[in-house]
Regions:
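Intrinsically disordered, low-complexity non-transmembrane regions of multi-pass membrane transporters
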Residues: 1, 62, 88-90, 250-306, ...
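Structural signature of hydrophobic alpha-helical transmembrane segments
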Residues: 2-13, 111, 347-349, 410-419
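Hydrophobic core segments of alpha-helical transmembrane domains in multi-pass membrane transport
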Residues: 12-24, 38-51, 116-125, 193-205, ...
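Juxtamembrane and boundary regions of transmembrane helices in multi-pass small-molecule transporters
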Residues: 23, 176-177, 201-281, 427-434, ...
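Interfacial/capping segments of alpha-helical transmembrane domains
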Residues: 36, 47-90, 327-355, 369-377
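Hydrophobic alpha-helical hairpins/lids featuring a short glycine-rich hinge
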Residues: 77-147
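Alpha-helical membrane segments and immediately flanking helix-loop junctions
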Residues: 146-204, 291, 295, 375-462
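Transmembrane helical segments that form the transport core of multi-pass membrane transport proteins
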Residues: 296, 304-398
Length: 468
C-alpha cells in the first residue's frame, strides 16, 4: 500500500461523501456520528477481512477473522464442486467445469445457473434450522451498536448480506408500515447495495473460471479468490449502505428505541417470509405461515424458488445482452456515417458509458489505462444490472485486457443490485408490506439507486487501497 494509493483512496472516499452530501434532502440534519462510526466499522471489516495475514504478523489472534473468512470462502469452493455433481447428472459433460476431466468447455446455462438452484435450497435449509437467524441477528447487533441506527433498519440491512432486496424486508414485516422516511430509505438502500447469496455463488463460479483461464492457476484458486472478495464486499456494504442512506435522507423524526427481532412459532425456523416477526412498539404482531415442515420440505421449496430465479436470470441475460448488441450496432452504424471508426471489440454504448463515467473510475482508484473500460462496466450495471456487468468483466478477465487492480475494484463496485430495474422490483416487493407507502417507495427509488451505487463504490475504493 503506497502513499499515493492511500491519498487517492482518501480522495475517493471524500468525493463519494461529497456527492452524497450534495444530493442530501436535509444537510443540516445529517448525523455525522453515524457517518463517522459507520465508516470506521467498514474500515475495521475491510482490514480484518482483506489484510488478516498482515495483521497476524503483529499479533497472531488478529489473523483469526481472516482465517475464518477464508474458511467460509473455501466452503463456497467446496459447494461449487458439489453443484457440479448435480449438474453433471442432468447435463452430462456439459455440466463439468473446464478443469474437470471430460469437460466440453465453459457453458453458462449448465455450470452457473444450477449454482443458483442449489444455493437457494441450502439457504432454505439453514433458515429452517434457525442458523441464518442467529447470524443475521449478530450482525444487526454489531451494526446497531456501532452506528446508533434503529433496530428495524439495522436488521433489514444485515439480512441483505445473505438474502435479496425483496426477502430482507420480510424479517421486519410488522415494522415496515411505521418506518420513518429515513428508515425506509435505509431498507431500500440495503437492498440496492448488496446481492443475494444465490447469485453471489454464481459469480464466484464463472469469475473464478475465467480468472483461472487467464492466469493459468487452478480453478479452485480463482474461485477462492473471488469468494473472499465477494463475501467481503457483501459484509462491507452493510455499514456503507446505512452511511449513504443517512446522508441522502437524514433522520428528521423521533424514532423509538426498538430492538427489532424476528422469531418463529413453535420453534419452526423458516425463511424470513414465513417467520413470525415480533413487534416491540407496544404491540405483538405474529405473522404465521405454513412454512416447510421438515428439512426435506425446506430443501425442495428452496430448490423450486431457485429454479425460478435461475430461469429469470437466464431470460434476463439473453434479453439484455441482445438489446445491448442492438444498441451497439445501431450507434456504431450511426457514428460510421460521420466517418468515425470504433476501436475493434468496443461497442458504441460501452465507449459512451466509459467516457461519461471515467472520472468516477479515476476517483475510486482505477488505473488510468482502464478507466473507460471500468466506466463501461459501471454504466452497464446501473442501466441493465450487475449480472450483465459481471459477464462483461469476466470476458475482460479472460481476454487479459485489464489490470489486476481494476479486476479487484470492479469486483467490489459491481457487487450490488443498484440499477434502474431494481426500483420496480422494490416497489413490487416492499409495497405489499406497506400498501399506503407505495408512492413513497417509488419516490425514493432513484435516491436509493444512487445511495447503493455510492456504497458499492465506497467498498471498492477501500478494497483498491488495501489490495491494490
Amino acid at each position: 500500500m503506497s502513499v499515493p494509493d492511500l491519498l487517492r483512496g482518501l480522495l475517493g472516499l471524500v468525493g463519494i461523501l461529497a456527492i452524497a452530501f450534495a444530493f442530501s434532502s436535509h444537510r443540516t440534519r445529517i448525523n455525522w456520528r453515524t457517518v463517522g462510526f459507520g465508516l470506521a466499522l467498514q474500515l475495521v471489516f475491510a482490514v480484518f477481512i482483506l489484510k488478516g495475514e498482515d495483521m497476524a504478523t503483529v499479533f497472531a489472534p488478529l489473523g483469526w477473522p481472516k482465517a475464518a473468512f477464508a474458511f467460509v470462502a473455501g466452503l463456497f469452493v467446496d459447494f461449487l464442486a458439489a453443484v457440479e455433481v448435480g449438474s453433471a447428472f442432468i447435463f452430462g459433460n456439459l455440466g463439468l467445469g473446464p478443469a474437470s476431466e471430460g469437460s466440453l468447455g465453459f457453458f453458462f446455462f449448465s455450470q452457473v445457473l444450477p449454482t443458483v438452484v442449489v444455493f437457494a435450497a441450502l439457504m432454505s435449509i439453514l433458515y429452517y434450522l434457525g442458523v441464518m437467524q442467529v447470524v443475521v441477528r449478530g450482525m444487526a447487533w454489531v451494526v446497531r451498536r456501532a452506528l446508533g441506527t434503529s433496530g428495524p433498519e439495522s436488521l433489514s440491512v444485515s439480512a441483505n448480506i445473505f438474502v435479496g432486496q425483496t426477502e430482507a424486508p420480510l424479517v421486519i414485516k410488522p415494522y415496515v408500515e411505521k418506518l420513518t422516511r429515513s428508515e425506509l430509505m435505509a431498507v431500500m438502500t440495503g437492498g440496492m447495495a448488496t446481492i443475494a447469496g444465490g447469485v453471489l455463488a454464481s459469480y464466484v463460479a464463472f469469475l473464478g473460471e475465467r480468472y483461472a483461464q487467464a492466469t493459468g492457476v487452478a480453478v479452485e484458486v480463482g474461485q477462492q479468490l473471488f469468494a473472499e472478495q465477494l463475501l467481503g464486499a457483501s459484509v462491507m456494504a452493510a455499514p456503507a449502505a446505512l452511511i449513504l442512506a443517512k446522508i441522502l435522507i437524514p433522520e428528521t423524526e423521533d424514532v423509538p428505541d426498538v430492538d427489532a427481532r424476528f422469531t418463529t412459532d413453535a420453534n419452526e425456523a423458516t425463511l424470513p417470509s414465513t417467520a413470525s416477526d415480533e413487534a416491540t412498539a407496544g404491540v405483538n404482531a405474529a405473522v404465521i405461515d405454513d412454512g416447510p415442515k421438515n428439512v426435506i420440505d425446506a430443501a425442495a421449496s428452496g430448490a423450486a424458488d431457485g429454479m425460478k430465479l435461475a430461469l429469470n436470470i437466464g431470460a434476463m441475460l439473453i434479453a439484455f445482452l441482445a438489446l445491448i448488441a442492438i444498441i451497439n450496432g445501431s450507434l456504431g452504424w450511426a457514428v460510421e456515417l460521420f466517418g468515425v471508426t470504433l476501436p475493434e471489440g468496443k461497442g458504441a454504448l460501452d465507449l459512451a458509458l466509459g467516457f461519461v463515467l471515467a472520472p468516477v473510475a479515476w476517483l475510486v482508484g482505477v488505473p488510468m489505462a482502464d478507466i473507460t473500460t471500468f466506466g463501461g462496466f459501471l454504466g452497464t450495471k446501473v442501466i441493465a444490472n450487475e449480472f450483465v456487468a459481471y459477464t462483461l468483466l469476466a470476458d475482460a478477465i479472460a481476454a487479459g485486457s485489464i489490470q489486476p487492480k481494476t479486476i479487484t475494484i470492479a469486483t467490489f463496485a459491481l457487487c450490488g443490485f443498484a440499477n434502474l430495474s431494481s426500483i420496480g422490483i422494490q416497489i413490487g416487493g416492499i409495497g405489499p408490506l406497506a400498501p399506503s407507502r407505495t408512492g413513497e417507495i417509488a419516490a425514493l427509488g432513484v435516491r436509493a439507486v444512487l445511495a447503493g451505487t455510492l456504497a458499492n463504490l465506497m467498498t471498492a475504493t477501500i478494497a483498491g487501497v488495501l489490495l491494490g
